[in-house]
Amino acid sequence: MKIPVTADAESASKDGLQHDDIRATATVRDRIKQFSAEASIPLEKASFSRQAPSQNPSITAKPPIPPQRAALKPGTKLVKATGTELCGNQQHGRSRNISPIAHFPAVPLSNKNTSAILSSDSETGAELADRREFTASKAVRHGSRDPHAEMSSWKSPTPLPQRKKEAPPVPPRSSQLSTESELLQLDPPSLHTDQEGSGVNHTLEVRESDISDSALADAMTASYLIPSHAALGSKRGLKQPPPPPPPRQRGSPSQPLLQLSSDSSKVNPPALGPDEILKRGMDMLDEPKSGSELPPKPPRRVTFNPNPEVFQIESGNVVQGQVISSERKRYEEVWEANRGVARFGVMHDPNVDQKVIRKSLAYEDLVVDLVVRDIWSRSRLPQAELAKIWKLVSHDAVGMLSREEFVVGMWLIDQCLKGHGLPTNVPKSVWKSVQ
Protein backbone atom coordinates (compact mmCIF):
# COMPACT_ATOMS: atom_id res chain seq x y z
CA MET A 1 0.00 0.00 0.00
CA LYS A 2 1.53 3.34 -1.07
CA ILE A 3 1.36 6.32 1.31
CA PRO A 4 0.44 9.63 -0.41
CA VAL A 5 3.09 12.36 -0.01
CA THR A 6 2.07 16.02 0.08
CA ALA A 7 4.03 18.83 -1.56
CA ASP A 8 4.82 20.55 1.74
CA ALA A 9 6.33 17.41 3.23
CA GLU A 10 8.36 16.79 0.08
CA SER A 11 9.79 20.31 -0.01
CA ALA A 12 10.60 20.20 3.71
CA SER A 13 12.43 16.94 3.34
CA LYS A 14 14.46 18.27 0.39
CA ASP A 15 15.53 21.38 2.34
CA GLY A 16 16.60 19.25 5.29
CA LEU A 17 18.59 16.92 3.08
CA GLN A 18 20.42 19.79 1.36
CA HIS A 19 21.34 21.30 4.72
CA ASP A 20 22.62 17.94 5.96
CA ASP A 21 24.61 17.39 2.76
CA ILE A 22 26.40 20.76 3.09
CA ARG A 23 27.32 20.09 6.70
CA ALA A 24 28.49 16.55 5.96
CA THR A 25 30.65 17.74 3.04
CA ALA A 26 32.41 20.31 5.22
CA THR A 27 33.06 17.75 7.94
CA VAL A 28 34.50 15.24 5.48
CA ARG A 29 36.84 17.85 3.98
CA ASP A 30 38.15 18.82 7.44
CA ARG A 31 38.77 15.18 8.27
CA ILE A 32 40.59 14.57 4.99
CA LYS A 33 42.91 17.53 5.61
CA GLN A 34 43.67 16.26 9.10
CA PHE A 35 44.40 12.74 7.81
CA SER A 36 46.69 14.11 5.05
CA ALA A 37 48.65 16.12 7.66
CA GLU A 38 49.14 13.07 9.87
CA ALA A 39 50.06 10.85 6.91
CA SER A 40 53.58 12.37 6.79
CA ILE A 41 54.58 10.08 9.73
CA PRO A 42 56.09 6.78 8.49
CA LEU A 43 53.69 3.79 8.63
CA GLU A 44 56.04 1.53 10.64
CA LYS A 45 56.63 4.14 13.37
CA ALA A 46 52.95 4.97 13.57
CA SER A 47 51.87 1.33 13.89
CA PHE A 48 54.56 -0.05 16.25
CA SER A 49 55.44 2.97 18.41
CA ARG A 50 54.05 2.93 21.93
CA GLN A 51 52.59 6.22 23.02
CA ALA A 52 52.41 7.16 26.65
CA PRO A 53 48.91 7.01 28.06
CA SER A 54 47.22 10.39 28.37
CA GLN A 55 46.44 11.82 31.73
CA ASN A 56 42.79 12.22 30.84
CA PRO A 57 41.31 8.71 30.65
CA SER A 58 38.40 9.88 28.51
CA ILE A 59 40.77 10.85 25.62
CA THR A 60 42.02 7.80 23.73
CA ALA A 61 44.97 7.62 21.33
CA LYS A 62 44.09 7.84 17.67
CA PRO A 63 45.11 4.87 15.54
CA PRO A 64 47.37 5.30 12.51
CA ILE A 65 45.81 6.06 9.15
CA PRO A 66 46.67 3.83 6.21
CA PRO A 67 48.28 5.61 3.24
CA GLN A 68 45.36 4.77 0.95
CA ARG A 69 42.95 6.78 3.10
CA ALA A 70 45.48 9.52 3.95
CA ALA A 71 46.03 10.38 0.25
CA LEU A 72 42.30 10.77 -0.23
CA LYS A 73 41.37 14.28 -1.55
CA PRO A 74 38.16 15.76 -2.79
CA GLY A 75 37.32 14.51 -6.26
CA THR A 76 39.84 11.61 -6.27
CA LYS A 77 38.89 8.08 -7.16
CA LEU A 78 39.34 5.11 -4.84
CA VAL A 79 41.53 2.38 -6.25
CA LYS A 80 40.47 -1.17 -5.50
CA ALA A 81 42.86 -2.81 -3.09
CA THR A 82 44.44 -6.06 -4.10
CA GLY A 83 44.06 -9.30 -2.17
CA THR A 84 47.55 -8.97 -0.63
CA GLU A 85 46.89 -5.44 0.66
CA LEU A 86 43.54 -6.46 2.13
CA CYS A 87 45.15 -9.39 3.95
CA GLY A 88 47.85 -7.09 5.31
CA ASN A 89 45.31 -4.55 6.52
CA GLN A 90 43.24 -7.27 8.17
CA GLN A 91 46.27 -8.70 9.92
CA HIS A 92 47.36 -5.25 11.05
CA GLY A 93 43.88 -4.50 12.40
CA ARG A 94 43.62 -7.84 14.22
CA SER A 95 47.06 -7.51 15.85
CA ARG A 96 46.01 -4.21 17.45
CA ASN A 97 42.34 -5.31 17.91
CA ILE A 98 41.30 -2.05 16.14
CA SER A 99 39.30 -1.89 12.92
CA PRO A 100 40.44 1.04 10.65
CA ILE A 101 36.94 1.60 9.33
CA ALA A 102 35.55 2.24 12.80
CA HIS A 103 37.52 5.55 13.18
CA PHE A 104 35.59 7.46 10.53
CA PRO A 105 32.98 9.74 12.04
CA ALA A 106 29.40 8.58 11.77
CA VAL A 107 28.08 11.51 9.66
CA PRO A 108 25.26 11.33 7.16
CA LEU A 109 26.23 11.68 3.52
CA SER A 110 24.09 12.99 0.70
CA ASN A 111 23.93 11.61 -2.77
CA LYS A 112 25.64 14.70 -4.33
CA ASN A 113 28.64 14.85 -1.95
CA THR A 114 29.08 11.11 -2.06
CA SER A 115 29.31 11.22 -5.83
CA ALA A 116 31.87 14.05 -5.56
CA ILE A 117 34.11 12.11 -3.17
CA LEU A 118 33.54 8.55 -4.36
CA SER A 119 33.29 7.90 -8.06
CA SER A 120 30.30 6.14 -9.49
CA ASP A 121 32.63 3.50 -10.90
CA SER A 122 33.49 2.03 -7.50
CA GLU A 123 31.25 -0.63 -5.98
CA THR A 124 31.27 1.09 -2.58
CA GLY A 125 29.87 4.29 -4.03
CA ALA A 126 27.04 2.46 -5.78
CA GLU A 127 26.13 0.61 -2.60
CA LEU A 128 26.12 3.80 -0.52
CA ALA A 129 24.00 5.58 -3.14
CA ASP A 130 21.40 2.81 -3.00
CA ARG A 131 21.27 2.94 0.80
CA ARG A 132 20.89 6.74 0.84
CA GLU A 133 18.00 6.57 -1.59
CA PHE A 134 16.32 3.98 0.64
CA THR A 135 16.74 6.08 3.80
CA ALA A 136 15.54 9.24 2.04
CA SER A 137 12.37 7.54 0.86
CA LYS A 138 11.84 6.10 4.35
CA ALA A 139 12.24 9.52 5.95
CA VAL A 140 9.74 11.05 3.52
CA ARG A 141 7.17 8.35 4.31
CA HIS A 142 7.41 8.60 8.08
CA GLY A 143 8.19 12.36 8.23
CA SER A 144 11.50 11.83 10.08
CA ARG A 145 14.31 14.40 9.62
CA ASP A 146 16.74 13.09 12.23
CA PRO A 147 20.13 12.50 10.52
CA HIS A 148 21.20 10.08 13.27
CA ALA A 149 18.14 7.93 12.57
CA GLU A 150 19.02 7.97 8.87
CA MET A 151 22.61 7.00 9.67
CA SER A 152 21.51 4.10 11.89
CA SER A 153 19.22 2.89 9.10
CA TRP A 154 22.12 2.22 6.69
CA LYS A 155 24.90 1.71 9.21
CA SER A 156 23.68 -1.70 10.48
CA PRO A 157 20.71 -3.80 9.46
CA THR A 158 17.88 -4.25 11.94
CA PRO A 159 18.53 -7.31 14.10
CA LEU A 160 16.11 -10.17 13.76
CA PRO A 161 13.98 -11.03 16.80
CA GLN A 162 15.59 -13.76 18.82
CA ARG A 163 13.95 -17.11 18.91
CA LYS A 164 12.52 -18.27 22.18
CA LYS A 165 14.24 -21.39 23.28
CA GLU A 166 11.58 -24.01 23.76
CA ALA A 167 12.42 -27.15 25.62
CA PRO A 168 12.16 -29.98 23.08
CA PRO A 169 10.03 -32.99 24.05
CA VAL A 170 11.83 -35.88 25.68
CA PRO A 171 12.58 -38.45 22.95
CA PRO A 172 11.90 -42.14 23.68
CA ARG A 173 14.65 -44.63 24.41
CA SER A 174 14.62 -45.98 20.84
CA SER A 175 15.48 -42.55 19.38
CA GLN A 176 18.29 -41.84 21.86
CA LEU A 177 20.90 -43.77 19.88
CA SER A 178 19.94 -42.07 16.62
CA THR A 179 20.14 -38.61 18.26
CA GLU A 180 23.57 -39.32 19.72
CA SER A 181 24.84 -40.64 16.38
CA GLU A 182 23.63 -37.49 14.60
CA LEU A 183 25.36 -35.30 17.17
CA LEU A 184 28.61 -37.20 16.73
CA GLN A 185 28.44 -36.77 12.95
CA LEU A 186 28.19 -32.96 13.24
CA ASP A 187 31.49 -31.10 12.98
CA PRO A 188 31.60 -28.28 15.59
CA PRO A 189 34.37 -26.22 13.83
CA SER A 190 32.42 -26.21 10.57
CA LEU A 191 29.46 -24.57 12.28
CA HIS A 192 31.49 -21.46 13.27
CA THR A 193 33.23 -20.69 9.94
CA ASP A 194 30.56 -18.60 8.23
CA GLN A 195 28.72 -17.01 11.16
CA GLU A 196 29.21 -13.42 9.86
CA GLY A 197 27.92 -14.15 6.36
CA SER A 198 24.84 -16.31 6.92
CA GLY A 199 22.28 -16.95 9.66
CA VAL A 200 21.78 -20.64 8.89
CA ASN A 201 24.87 -21.68 10.82
CA HIS A 202 23.75 -19.59 13.78
CA THR A 203 20.47 -21.50 13.96
CA LEU A 204 22.35 -24.79 13.69
CA GLU A 205 24.56 -23.74 16.58
CA VAL A 206 21.54 -22.81 18.69
CA ARG A 207 19.86 -26.14 17.94
CA GLU A 208 23.04 -28.01 18.73
CA SER A 209 23.40 -26.23 22.09
CA ASP A 210 19.75 -26.92 22.88
CA ILE A 211 20.12 -30.61 22.07
CA SER A 212 23.41 -31.01 23.90
CA ASP A 213 22.28 -29.16 27.05
CA SER A 214 18.62 -29.92 27.65
CA ALA A 215 17.38 -32.62 25.28
CA LEU A 216 20.34 -34.95 25.68
CA ALA A 217 20.23 -34.73 29.48
CA ASP A 218 16.48 -35.32 29.54
CA ALA A 219 16.78 -38.24 27.13
CA MET A 220 19.51 -39.92 29.18
CA THR A 221 17.53 -39.43 32.40
CA ALA A 222 14.37 -40.84 30.83
CA SER A 223 16.26 -43.83 29.41
CA TYR A 224 17.51 -44.72 32.89
CA LEU A 225 14.12 -44.21 34.59
CA ILE A 226 11.82 -45.96 32.06
CA PRO A 227 13.07 -49.58 32.67
CA SER A 228 12.82 -49.21 36.46
CA HIS A 229 9.25 -47.85 36.22
CA ALA A 230 8.30 -50.62 33.78
CA ALA A 231 9.76 -53.26 36.06
CA LEU A 232 7.95 -51.81 39.08
CA GLY A 233 4.71 -51.61 37.15
CA SER A 234 5.00 -55.23 36.00
CA LYS A 235 5.77 -56.39 39.55
CA ARG A 236 2.84 -54.52 40.97
CA GLY A 237 0.55 -55.92 38.29
CA LEU A 238 1.53 -59.53 39.02
CA LYS A 239 1.13 -59.38 42.80
CA GLN A 240 -2.52 -58.88 43.69
CA PRO A 241 -3.91 -59.22 47.19
CA PRO A 242 -6.26 -62.18 47.73
CA PRO A 243 -9.96 -61.37 48.03
CA PRO A 244 -11.27 -61.13 51.61
CA PRO A 245 -13.24 -64.14 52.89
CA PRO A 246 -17.04 -63.75 53.03
CA PRO A 247 -18.48 -63.03 56.50
CA ARG A 248 -19.91 -66.02 58.31
CA GLN A 249 -23.64 -65.78 59.02
CA ARG A 250 -25.45 -67.81 61.63
CA GLY A 251 -28.82 -69.19 60.59
CA SER A 252 -30.47 -72.43 59.60
CA PRO A 253 -28.25 -75.47 58.81
CA SER A 254 -29.29 -75.42 55.15
CA GLN A 255 -28.41 -71.75 54.59
CA PRO A 256 -24.58 -72.07 54.91
CA LEU A 257 -24.60 -75.06 52.57
CA LEU A 258 -26.50 -73.11 49.91
CA GLN A 259 -24.24 -70.11 50.35
CA LEU A 260 -21.16 -72.31 50.06
CA SER A 261 -22.44 -73.88 46.83
CA SER A 262 -23.24 -70.46 45.31
CA ASP A 263 -19.85 -68.98 46.25
CA SER A 264 -17.90 -71.99 44.98
CA SER A 265 -18.28 -70.78 41.39
CA LYS A 266 -16.69 -67.41 42.27
CA VAL A 267 -13.94 -68.29 44.75
CA ASN A 268 -12.48 -71.76 45.19
CA PRO A 269 -12.75 -72.64 48.91
CA PRO A 270 -9.73 -74.21 50.57
CA ALA A 271 -9.63 -77.98 50.81
CA LEU A 272 -10.99 -79.26 54.15
CA GLY A 273 -9.94 -82.42 55.88
CA PRO A 274 -12.41 -85.03 57.14
CA ASP A 275 -11.99 -83.85 60.74
CA GLU A 276 -12.84 -80.25 59.85
CA ILE A 277 -15.88 -81.31 57.82
CA LEU A 278 -17.15 -83.43 60.71
CA LYS A 279 -16.56 -80.60 63.18
CA ARG A 280 -18.49 -78.13 61.00
CA GLY A 281 -21.36 -80.57 60.69
CA MET A 282 -21.53 -80.96 64.47
CA ASP A 283 -21.51 -77.19 64.91
CA MET A 284 -24.41 -76.80 62.50
CA LEU A 285 -26.40 -79.45 64.34
CA ASP A 286 -25.76 -77.75 67.68
CA GLU A 287 -27.03 -74.40 66.41
CA PRO A 288 -30.61 -73.51 67.42
CA LYS A 289 -33.21 -73.95 64.71
CA SER A 290 -35.40 -71.11 65.99
CA GLY A 291 -34.76 -67.48 65.17
CA SER A 292 -33.82 -66.65 68.77
CA GLU A 293 -30.11 -66.24 69.25
CA LEU A 294 -28.63 -68.08 72.21
CA PRO A 295 -25.19 -67.55 73.71
CA PRO A 296 -22.60 -69.86 72.13
CA LYS A 297 -21.76 -73.03 74.00
CA PRO A 298 -18.28 -73.40 75.40
CA PRO A 299 -16.03 -75.78 73.46
CA ARG A 300 -15.90 -79.36 74.62
CA ARG A 301 -12.81 -80.39 76.48
CA VAL A 302 -11.34 -83.73 75.49
CA THR A 303 -9.26 -85.32 78.24
CA PHE A 304 -6.70 -88.04 77.68
CA ASN A 305 -5.05 -90.29 80.22
CA PRO A 306 -1.34 -89.44 80.23
CA ASN A 307 -0.46 -92.96 81.45
CA PRO A 308 -2.34 -95.48 79.30
CA GLU A 309 -1.12 -98.44 81.37
CA VAL A 310 -3.10 -97.28 84.41
CA PHE A 311 -6.83 -98.03 84.15
CA GLN A 312 -9.50 -96.92 86.55
CA ILE A 313 -11.59 -100.01 87.26
CA GLU A 314 -14.71 -99.41 89.27
CA SER A 315 -15.35 -102.09 91.88
CA GLY A 316 -19.11 -101.60 92.04
CA ASN A 317 -19.65 -101.97 88.26
CA VAL A 318 -19.37 -105.73 87.92
CA VAL A 319 -19.27 -107.47 84.57
CA GLN A 320 -22.65 -108.91 83.62
CA GLY A 321 -24.30 -110.14 80.45
CA GLN A 322 -22.99 -112.35 77.65
CA VAL A 323 -20.55 -112.42 74.75
CA ILE A 324 -21.92 -111.00 71.49
CA SER A 325 -21.57 -113.09 68.33
CA SER A 326 -19.40 -110.45 66.61
CA GLU A 327 -17.04 -110.35 69.57
CA ARG A 328 -16.94 -114.13 69.78
CA LYS A 329 -15.94 -114.47 66.12
CA ARG A 330 -13.12 -111.97 66.59
CA TYR A 331 -11.76 -113.79 69.62
CA GLU A 332 -12.01 -117.20 67.90
CA GLU A 333 -9.91 -115.91 64.97
CA VAL A 334 -7.12 -115.05 67.41
CA TRP A 335 -7.38 -118.51 69.00
CA GLU A 336 -7.29 -120.26 65.59
CA ALA A 337 -4.07 -118.45 64.66
CA ASN A 338 -2.24 -119.43 67.89
CA ARG A 339 -3.52 -122.95 68.84
CA GLY A 340 -1.22 -126.03 68.80
CA VAL A 341 2.02 -124.03 68.91
CA ALA A 342 3.52 -126.20 71.72
CA ARG A 343 2.96 -129.44 69.78
CA PHE A 344 5.46 -128.58 67.03
CA GLY A 345 8.14 -127.67 69.54
CA VAL A 346 7.80 -130.98 71.37
CA MET A 347 7.84 -133.15 68.25
CA HIS A 348 11.13 -131.73 66.97
CA ASP A 349 12.92 -132.14 70.30
CA PRO A 350 14.91 -135.50 70.29
CA ASN A 351 15.25 -135.61 74.08
CA VAL A 352 11.46 -135.65 74.70
CA ASP A 353 9.83 -138.98 75.55
CA GLN A 354 7.34 -140.54 73.13
CA LYS A 355 4.60 -140.48 75.79
CA VAL A 356 4.91 -136.75 76.04
CA ILE A 357 4.65 -136.50 72.27
CA ARG A 358 1.44 -138.57 72.24
CA LYS A 359 0.01 -136.40 74.99
CA SER A 360 0.86 -133.24 73.08
CA LEU A 361 -1.09 -134.50 70.09
CA ALA A 362 -4.18 -134.48 72.35
CA TYR A 363 -3.46 -130.88 73.21
CA GLU A 364 -3.70 -129.73 69.60
CA ASP A 365 -6.68 -127.41 70.29
CA LEU A 366 -5.05 -125.74 73.29
CA VAL A 367 -3.02 -122.52 73.56
CA VAL A 368 0.13 -122.56 75.65
CA ASP A 369 0.46 -120.16 78.59
CA LEU A 370 3.52 -118.47 77.05
CA VAL A 371 1.52 -117.56 73.97
CA VAL A 372 -1.44 -116.44 76.08
CA ARG A 373 0.74 -114.15 78.18
CA ASP A 374 2.28 -112.61 75.03
CA ILE A 375 -1.15 -111.86 73.53
CA TRP A 376 -2.82 -110.57 76.69
CA SER A 377 0.11 -108.32 77.68
CA ARG A 378 -0.47 -106.26 74.53
CA SER A 379 -3.63 -104.87 76.19
CA ARG A 380 -1.35 -102.91 78.62
CA LEU A 381 -3.30 -104.05 81.65
CA PRO A 382 -1.41 -104.57 84.90
CA GLN A 383 0.08 -108.04 85.42
CA ALA A 384 -2.03 -108.50 88.57
CA GLU A 385 -5.24 -108.02 86.61
CA LEU A 386 -4.08 -110.45 83.94
CA ALA A 387 -3.28 -113.04 86.64
CA LYS A 388 -6.80 -112.70 88.08
CA ILE A 389 -8.33 -113.22 84.66
CA TRP A 390 -6.18 -116.36 84.16
CA LYS A 391 -7.46 -117.82 87.44
CA LEU A 392 -11.09 -117.05 86.55
CA VAL A 393 -11.03 -118.85 83.19
CA SER A 394 -8.49 -121.70 83.70
CA HIS A 395 -10.15 -124.92 85.02
CA ASP A 396 -7.26 -127.41 84.61
CA ALA A 397 -3.85 -126.49 85.92
CA VAL A 398 -1.98 -127.77 82.88
CA GLY A 399 -0.65 -124.40 81.70
CA MET A 400 -2.91 -124.25 78.63
CA LEU A 401 -6.31 -122.76 77.69
CA SER A 402 -9.07 -124.25 75.58
CA ARG A 403 -11.16 -122.38 73.01
CA GLU A 404 -13.96 -121.37 75.46
CA GLU A 405 -11.47 -120.35 78.14
CA PHE A 406 -9.40 -118.25 75.73
CA VAL A 407 -12.51 -116.47 74.32
CA VAL A 408 -13.91 -115.65 77.80
CA GLY A 409 -10.53 -114.36 78.93
CA MET A 410 -10.33 -112.03 75.89
CA TRP A 411 -13.85 -110.78 76.63
CA LEU A 412 -12.97 -109.99 80.27
CA ILE A 413 -9.94 -107.99 79.12
CA ASP A 414 -12.16 -105.84 76.88
CA GLN A 415 -14.58 -105.25 79.74
CA CYS A 416 -11.75 -104.07 81.97
CA LEU A 417 -10.59 -101.68 79.26
CA LYS A 418 -14.14 -100.29 79.13
CA GLY A 419 -14.01 -99.54 82.87
CA HIS A 420 -15.88 -102.50 84.35
CA GLY A 421 -14.62 -104.43 87.36
CA LEU A 422 -13.75 -108.14 87.47
CA PRO A 423 -16.36 -110.42 89.04
CA THR A 424 -15.59 -113.06 91.67
CA ASN A 425 -16.93 -115.75 89.34
CA VAL A 426 -17.76 -115.70 85.64
CA PRO A 427 -21.57 -115.80 85.14
CA LYS A 428 -23.10 -118.91 83.54
CA SER A 429 -24.71 -116.79 80.82
CA VAL A 430 -21.23 -115.89 79.60
CA TRP A 431 -20.14 -119.53 79.34
CA LYS A 432 -23.31 -120.46 77.48
CA SER A 433 -22.81 -117.67 74.92
CA VAL A 434 -19.37 -119.03 73.91
CA GLN A 435 -20.34 -122.74 73.56
Curated annotation (Swiss-Prot):
Gene3D superfamilies given for it?
A: EF-hand
- Composition bias type Low complexity, residue spans: 174-186, 249-265
> PROSITE patterns under this entry?
EH (PS50031)
For this protein, the record's CDD domains field holds: EH
Checking InterPro entries in the record gives: EF-hand-dom_pair, EH_dom
The keyword RNA-binding is annotated on this UniProt entry: no
Q: Which of UniProt's keywords are assigned here?
A: Lipid metabolism
Instruction: Decide whether keyword Lipid metabolism is in the record.
Output: yes
GO cellular component assignments = cytoplasm; plasma membrane
Report the residue ranges that make up the EH domain in this protein: 327-435
Family according to the record: Belongs to the IRS4 family.
According to its UniProt entry, what is the function of this protein? Positive regulator of phosphatidylinositol 4,5-bisphosphate turnover and negatively regulates signaling through the cell integrity pathway. Involved in rDNA silencing.
**Where do Polar residues bias regions lie?**
48-59
**Residue ranges with Basic and acidic residues bias:** 11-20
Q: Gene name, please? A: IRS4
> Region Disordered: what ranges?
1-20, 39-71, 136-204, 233-277
- Could you identify this protein by its name? Increased rDNA silencing protein 4
